[in-house]
């Protein structure tokens, strides 16, 4: 039998701690189990959404409801595995007029690789052609180092790729919604998204990668994008790396004091393309 190291959680309520313990129970190398000193609270939830956009919209709606119920924005956080996941939340929350503060990363449209991509897209506005504009976007970003497949090594290279890939996905999404859209329409839509990203505010909800949320706590925490390939990340290939992903989920869950809402989306796009599966880390969890 394994001896468990019991550690008291003064932060999270019993339902959150019980769920976090279930996650760690599958990691034989980690004997820590938490015991809550805070007592009962609302059950944690897990929701599947049809697309990334729907996930961000519905989380935005729930955040607005929490704020209306009296929770201050600074007591709310949305956590995710990789920095490029922030863009859709920046846009959706900005559209709702909810101020956001990004932790451990620049706002999406302020990232150097994104600024450079926009400059190059603008430079390509005069190029006339009959091809779908999303292909032109791929060509332009391809000249900046984007490839259809994520690079295997180097955190910096991966983060740059993820930012550029987000732009490719936004192009695909606009193309799917409006077959007649051209490159100028796409650049205009990016400018609009950029404007919707609010200036930082002291009383803002936090958007953060799980790594940059370590050691912090909020009243209400949304952990988004819990699909296979995101958490666990696609390049976690060894048992050790997989257990590291499991511990990241545990860290994300135990940032919440009272409310914990987990979610994932069944596809990347609203048209159902980019099919996803629920994270294996959520398998067999009892809510």
Locate predicted features.
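Helicase P-loop NTPase motor core
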Residues: 1-2, 8-98, 124-126, 161, ...
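Conserved helicase motor
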Residues: 83, 104-111
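Conserved helicase C-terminal RecA-like lobe
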Residues: 86, 90-98, 111-287
């Amino acid at each position: 039998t394994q001896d468990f190291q019991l550690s008291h959680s003064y932060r999270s309520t019993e339902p959150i701690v019980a769920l976090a313990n279930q996650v760690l129970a599958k990691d034989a190398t980690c004997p820590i189990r938490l015991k809550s000193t805070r007592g009962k609270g609302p059950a944690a939830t897990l929701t599947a959404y049809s697309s990334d956009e729907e996930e961000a919209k519905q989380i935005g709606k729930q955040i607005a409801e929490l704020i209306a119920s009296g929770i201050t924005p600074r007591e709310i956080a949305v956590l995710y595995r990789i920095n490029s996941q922030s863009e859709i939340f920046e846009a959706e929350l900005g559209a709702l007029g909810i101020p956001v503060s990004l932790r451990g990363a620049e706002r999406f449209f302020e990232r150097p690789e994104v600024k450079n991509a926009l400059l190059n897209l603008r430079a390509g506005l005069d190029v006339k052609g009959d091809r779908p504009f999303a292909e032109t976007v791929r060509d332009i970003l391809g000249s900046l180092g984007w490839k259809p497949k994520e690079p295997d090594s180097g955190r910096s290279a991966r983060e740059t790729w993820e930012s550029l890939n987000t732009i490719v996905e936004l192009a695909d999404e606009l193309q799917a919604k409006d077959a007649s859209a051209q490159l100028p329409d796409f650049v205009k839509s990016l400018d609009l998204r950029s404007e919707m990203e609010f200036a930082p505010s002291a009383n803002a909800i936090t958007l953060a990668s799980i790594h940059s949320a370590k050691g912090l706590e909020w009243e209400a925490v949304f952990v988004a994008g819990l699909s296979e390939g995101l958490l666990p990340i696609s390049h976690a290939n060894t048992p050790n790396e997989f257990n590291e992903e499991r511990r990241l989920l545990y860290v994300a869950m135990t940032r919440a004091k009272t409310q914990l809402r987990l979610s994932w989306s069944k596809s990347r796009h609203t048209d159902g393309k980019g099919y996803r599966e629920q994270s294996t880390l959520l398998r067999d969890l009892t809510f």
